[in-house]
Amino acid sequence: ADRIFVMGHVNEDYDAIGATIGMAKLGLSLGKETYIVSSEHNAYYKRITEVLDNENIILSANETKYIDIMRSGADALPLVTNKSLLIIVDHHREVLSASKAVLQAAKNRIIIDHHRRAEDIIGDTTLLYLEPSSSSTSELVTELIGYFDDRLDITPAEATALYAGIVLDTKNFNVQTGERTFEAAALLRRCGANPNLIRQLFKDDLSFVQQKAKLIAGAKMPIPGLSIAIMRNADNDTMSSVLAAQTADTLITIESVAVGMAIVEYKDG
């Protein structure tokens, strides 16, 4: 490949970010021109760089800062050639891709994901690595890093980003965990992943907490065991998907609630 592009899903979360950083690390270590294709609204990446910057930790691979190799879909598209490789992480459906244009332009594609296979899976892939039993895509990428090269040095910042992805999707190691999850976490801890920084990453501001409390307070139980919260007019809220996910997680911690749902309403449907 002349260039490597790594792309997560739209509105990337910590798992998508950790996985893109991990795969970009592998590309850079091979001496390849490597780019991360990101969506327009990337609040999680901004958050992780802010937390690391506050500790004077630079998220980089050797002399390359990851923020410097990030490209929007529009900026990345002219760089894609017939020899380029696109690594798709943490999703496998075109509708979820950070850039559909880059996806369609890339002739050589690899998918690495932990979600169950959907009917509308992206086709024409060189390699398809779907592992639904894995806790997260960050776990899968950490395993690949472990197998890749003994000389590959993972920095504490890179390890922290991958660790954050595992923590997010396992809800702090409470769900969807197995032996491989803890082995990956142990590898990242040996590389310097910082749990204290992880806790800072998952802190929410007061406005976010108030929004979540409002949604929970307005939740209804149409039938026993099912609780539904509805978030309306969310078109301009870049954190709406995160808010919905956290609201649903909170609903199922309520006694007598077996299923928690948070529905986000957009004007375009």
Predicted regions and their residues:
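Hydrophobic helix-and-loop "lid/oligomerization" segment in the mid-to-C-terminal part
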Residues: 1-12, 16-56, 60-61, 66-69, ...
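Short, hinge-like loop/turn segments at secondary-structure boundaries
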Residues: 51-56, 105, 128-130
